[in-house]
Amino acid sequence: MFHRLWTLIRKELQSLLREPQTRAILILPVLIQVILFPFAATLEVTNATIAIYDEDNGEHSVELTQRFARASAFTHVLLLKSPQEIRPTIDTQKALLLVRFPADFSRKLDTFQTAPLQLILDGRNSNSAQIAANYLQQIVKNYQQELLEGKPKPNNSELVVRNWYNPNLDYKWFVVPSLIAMITTIGVMIVTSLSVAREREQGTLDQLLVSPLTTWQIFIGKAVPALIVATFQATIVLAIGIWAYQIPFAGSLALFYFTMVIYGLSLVGFGLLISSLCSTQQQAFIGVFVFMMPAILLSGYVSPVENMPVWLQNLTWINPIRHFTDITKQIYLKDASLDIVWNSLWPLLVITATTGSAAYAMFRRKVM
């Protein structure tokens, strides 16, 4: 029995890796994505342009302008000469945001009065503008604290911020663990969804059906190669993250690969379900992308799940990518134990049992 199963698994791997183009498809996209995504898919604001309209030209407004210019988020500073330039600057997207110093700004600061600043953001790029505004607020806050040194303070408390699990708040530390889930999802879904459709197109499905193999053996034989491919791709991303991006892996490799197998099995159910419903590889390929786009959007990678409407948050519970993304980040960055990741692991087990049973039933009805 196991010899037959191993023969089928080996046959699936050989048919998958026979052509150089197929091997390249399984490796090159992984390398390209893990190199490009940490730099391109980031919410950090860099190389932005800030506009300054200074009606004060006093000591404090000039000092703050210089500090804004030295910030790493802003590489260009536009100094406006009249209020008439404000609207065209924002309308033509010459600047992401604009700071306006009133005429009495420095005088009020020297007399310890409240000195307001006007900050105008480009709402067409609301996310980046809001992040840049937070940078400016931090700069202003730090300058305010410097002015208060040696002066009577309302209290003696001080807020000390420590960033756990990502000390430098490097966005790559968020992207790379999430990429493990994204890339392995694509690998598993493509391998499993195209497997049965490829057999139909090549005319080898009938030969497989008349073989001594049982239904569950064929089912497992189609699933195991996808798990092997997913594990291999995850290992590539993990190695690049550790040695190329210097992101330390804090957790247990055994726990990581255990949850990786559970996650792969949950995706195998989706993939074989798509493969059983499709007659051609083209249909299966389209089915994969119909699944992938909503799954990625609802995974918490693009935007936090907590920011979604409640009904959409409830819908994300059936999305395996959401749970494995949480598991990967907790194991990778936090050295989480099985007790901690269990809250995300048990939904994966439920999804695995549900999709696996549905795919097996559909596989028997449509294929056998």
Curated annotation (Swiss-Prot):
Membrane topology (Cytoplasmic): 1-24, 195-222, 275-284, 361-368
| One annotated Gene Ontology cellular component of this protein | plasma membrane
Domain of life (superkingdom): Bacteria
Span of domain ABC transmembrane type-2: 129-366
Instruction: Please indicate the ranges of residues that lie on the Periplasmic side.
Output: 46-173, 244-253, 306-339
The way it spans or sits in the membrane comes to: Multi-pass membrane protein
Q: Where in the cell is it found?
A: Cell inner membrane
Alphabetical GO biological process terms: DNA damage response; lithium ion transmembrane transport; sodium ion transmembrane transport; tetracycline transmembrane transport; xenobiotic detoxification by transmembrane export across the plasma membrane; xenobiotic transmembrane transport
Principal subcellular localisation of the protein = membrane
Q: Which GO terms describe its molecular function?
A: ABC-type transporter activity; efflux transmembrane transporter activity
TM region(s), chain numbering? 25-45, 174-194, 223-243, 254-274, 285-305, 340-360
Keywords on record: Cell inner membrane, Cell membrane, Membrane, Transmembrane, Transmembrane helix, Transport
What is its induction behaviour?
Answer: Repressed by the transcriptional regulator CecR.
Known function: Part of the ABC transporter complex YbhFSR that could be involved in efflux of cefoperazone. Probably involved in the translocation of the substrate across the membrane.
Q: What family is it from?
A: Belongs to the ABC-2 integral membrane protein family.
Subunit and interaction comment: The complex is probably composed of two ATP-binding proteins (YbhF) and two transmembrane proteins (YbhR and YbhS).
Descriptive protein name: Probable multidrug ABC transporter permease YbhR
Source organism of this protein record:
Escherichia coli (strain K12)
At the highest ranks, the source species' classification is: Bacteria, Pseudomonadati, Pseudomonadota, Gammaproteobacteria, Enterobacterales
Report which gene this protein is encoded by.
Answer: ybhR
